[in-house]
């Protein structure tokens, strides 16, 4: 089992860092490669993450050829010919995002069986919106134990209103609708950049998707899709993590290839806090002096609100800012577990249901801490950089799901950090 050791206290990040393709984009893109019955699909700018290997295995388990060239960061998928309709439990159970294969398999084969997914232990994250939407399109859904079975000889276009703008449900229904007969409208759809990226891939495959990035999606079904090429969009959450890292260490960092528009909610709060953020030709520059920063109140919301996937990292920043900051988490319950670990480092915080009060400005102390989920692992490492003494972060399987060589990128910016293997 690996662990990360951080020697904190004097870290001031300087330089530039390159951002990978988005983890939250590439997983549904891989699910979409199930749809084309003709030709091959090439995905480029693919991040090398454990979740990507897991999703590759999910798709491969459908008797689809998947070749991952890690050196080129490319995945070539050939789904032409007959494919299986049962997603392999051993891989689906490892990752929440794997539920997005349900819609593509059903649309392609008329029948699909997928086990209840696994992944980070952040709240209940129910999949009822996925299932209600597919039922509206004519699917018969049955749940037996931990398995979900969906059947529909031919999906039919439908008007779907989602009670909540779920990213996963929007992706699942959008993909299923591409091969349905007639027109599907999804109201209150998720608007994240990863939704737009998926729609762009589907349209390159021959789909007719309109409205991606707005509250209303319209999909006109077609008879078949074909393979294509697509470059995965940059990871706004990785970019945001390094922006926060620069701010909390009084650093000066150019986050290369970061997209301003995708990070606008985070940038707005950084600037409100007093961080200097500027758009440059090849990325976003972040400069800060933590002594001059002021506390803020942040509420997580679906896009274009403040992203829940940046909540943990931002609370680490709040910890170094003098005064009382407030973080309100409205998207997922049970997403303040990292604060319990940061209490071991001396953080003073009170948590009441969906709200955390952060009493910042007091020096953190290095301590052994344990990652509780993907973004918490990054937050604890960032906290370790500004803490006095040594911080040891364990349970790195979470980190590897969403960050590629995180410790090496931080070290290149000046952090005193290393990753070691325990016997």
From Swiss-Prot:
Pfam families: EPSP_synthase (PF00275)
Sequence similarity: Belongs to the EPSP synthase family. MurA subfamily.
GO cellular component, one term: cytoplasm
Chief location of this protein within or outside the cell: cytoplasm
This protein's name: UDP-N-acetylglucosamine 1-carboxyvinyltransferase 2
Residues annotated for phosphoenolpyruvate binding in this entry: 23-24
Chain positions recorded as UDP-N-acetyl-alpha-D-glucosamine binding sites: 96, 125-129, 309, 331
GO BP field: cell division; cell wall organization; peptidoglycan biosynthetic process; regulation of cell shape; UDP-N-acetylgalactosamine biosynthetic process
Example of a GO MF term: UDP-N-acetylglucosamine 1-carboxyvinyltransferase activity
Subcellular location as annotated: Cytoplasm
InterPro entries found in the cross-reference section: Enolpyruvate_Tfrase_dom, Enolpyruvate_Tfrase_sf, MurA_subfamily, RNA3'P_cycl/enolpyr_Trfase_a/b, UDP_GlcNAc_COvinyl_MurA
Pathway: Cell wall biogenesis; peptidoglycan biosynthesis
